[in-house]
Regions:
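N-terminal non-catalytic structural scaffold regions of very large proteins
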Residues: 1-240
């Protein structure tokens, strides 16, 4: 229903875009609570059924199918309807392959001054297990080739996007096409310059991802002797 609101011409254009954001927020909450609860139930080997009589694995499979279809629909609405409509109103989002030479120079300077100093690559190897990344944060997993400054062979690394920076940045007016206000994505800037964060190494792949963590409270007051302590433990686990 929320997605259909994004297609309704009766709503102002930015409100229609907002409906896509609401849909994403709703999906996050659904996966944090409902899907997380199902996965926890499956992990415990609990095959108790719901009111509809279906097993947890069957419910999870159906959720996956429906969610994938809805996400595809969401991006169709964004790319085929809303972004062209925004562009017709003079608002444009520049992809990496659309940057002009002057825009690339501006992005390079911004990356050097504002992004590189606050981004901390995390190596992945047997001595460094997968890190505890912040819930719903933007990250990149990077495939590397070559050796670093310490002579270590390349492998995999994670780039957490700085949370102190906005996801969208406006290009200076003199760099925009005539009649347009243009923006670039933080993710595009990191992707374009990821190799500069690994001197002496070659980036063979750079892939954007985010984690949605379990936010379902799983404390049973009948099974713990100290409910307050159990709740504190659950809350401490939410630091990420």
């Amino acid at each position: 229903r929320v997605l259909e609101q994004a297609l309704d011409d009766a709503h102002p254009l930015l409100n229609r875009l907002m409906f896509l954001l609401i849909f994403s927020s709703n999906m996050d909450e659904f996966f944090e609570i409902r899907v997380a609860g199902l996965k926890h139930q499956i992990a415990l080997g609990d095959d108790s059924t719901g009111a509809d009589g279906r097993l947890p694995k069957a419910v999870l499979a159906e959720i996956s199918e429906i969610a994938h279809a809805q996400i595809v629909r969401q991006y169709e609405i964004l790319n085929d309807t809303l972004l062209p409509a925004l562009e017709a109103q003079g608002l444009r989002f520049r992809r990496r392959d659309q940057w002009t030479k002057a825009q690339k120079d501006w992005v390079q300077e911004l990356f050097n001054n504002d992004i590189m100093p606050v981004i901390s690559p995390i190596g992945l190897d047997p001595s460094h297990p997968f890190p505890r990344l912040v819930n719903k944060s933007l990250n990149f997993i990077v495939e590397l080739e070559g050796k670093d400054a310490f002579g270590r062979a390349g492998g995999m690394a994670i780039l957490p996007a700085p949370r102190s920076l906005p996801r969208l940045m406006a290009l200076p007016k003199h760099l925009c096409s005539e009649g347009f206000t243009e923006y670039v994505f933080l993710s595009s800037m990191i992707h374009a310059h990821a190799e500069e964060l690994f001197p002496g190494m070659k980036v063979r792949g750079c892939y954007q991802f985010r984690l949605t963590r379990n936010a379902d409270m799983s404390v049973d007051p009948e099974e713990v002797s100290d409910l307050a302590s159990a709740l504190r433990g659950e809350l401490l686990a939410r630091r990420y």
